[in-house]
């Protein structure tokens, strides 16, 4: 199983655990008092796990084919974004005090990035051509995240400097969640 799938599954587990704690509980306890261990009792597959993002909703993280970089989506407002955008990190980075490199346009909402086999390009879905503003976000139900489905997503290929080099779709519909075969 590729690391990217393990990262994605682990992110969902962490996301659910974090969302069960309310901000008041977190603010009233020191870091030592909080359970900062990122593994779960009985976990036998994850080792040496470290937190790499601090704040915002971070998801859809995937490793490059050479395992040197990770691409992920985030809406962390401290990074100057209002809705999900694509970010890049090297495998030894952490973003507690610095902003990662943005690969998407910074306009519209983006989702579902994935490395191309050359490790020099990614693909991702974005609504930026239909509207440069963030589309309306669905209301959370009982505090839970609701996945937005927009018919204005199209799929793009960009280089690691954030330049779009091609557009792969051009029709109304939910064009997102693409993946790439390594060959």
Model regions and ranges:
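Catalytic phosphate/metal-binding cores of nucleic-acid and nucleotide-processing enzymes, i.e., regions
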Residues: 63-65, 85-86
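Hydrophobic beta-strand positions that form the internal "hydrophobic ladder"
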Residues: 70-71, 122
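A flexible loop/linker signature enriched in serine peptidases of the S9 family
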Residues: 54-57, 73-86, 104-110, 125-154, ...
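Polybasic, low-complexity, intrinsically disordered segments
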Residues: 1-19
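Blade/loop signatures of beta-propeller domains
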Residues: 24-47, 153
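Multi-bladed beta-propeller domains
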Residues: 36-57, 89-109, 158-174
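Residue-level detector of Asp-centered blade-edge/turn motifs that repeat once per structural unit
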Residues: 65-66, 117-118, 182-183
């Amino acid at each position: 199983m590729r690391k990217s799938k393990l990262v994605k599954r682990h992110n969902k587990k962490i996301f659910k655990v974090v969302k069960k704690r309310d901000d008041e509980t977190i603010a009233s306890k020191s870091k030592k008092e909080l359970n900062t261990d990122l593994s779960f009792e009985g976990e036998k597959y994850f080792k040496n796990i470290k937190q790499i993002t601090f704040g915002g909703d971070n998801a859809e993280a995937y490793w490059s084919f050479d395992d040197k970089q990770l691409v992920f989506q985030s809406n962390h407002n401290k990074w100057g974004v209002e809705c999900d955008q694509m970010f890049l990190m090297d495998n030894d980075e952490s973003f507690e005090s610095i902003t990662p490199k943005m690969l998407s346009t910074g306009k519209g909402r983006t989702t579902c990035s994935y490395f191309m086999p050359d490790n020099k390009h990614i693909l991702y879905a974005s609504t930026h051509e239909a509207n440069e503003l963030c589309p309306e976000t669905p209301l959370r139900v009982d505090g839970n995240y609701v996945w937005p489905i927009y018919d204005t997503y199209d799929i793009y290929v960009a280089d690691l400097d954030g330049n779009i080099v091609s557009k792969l779709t051009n029709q109304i519909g939910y064009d997102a969640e693409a993946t790439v075969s390594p060959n």
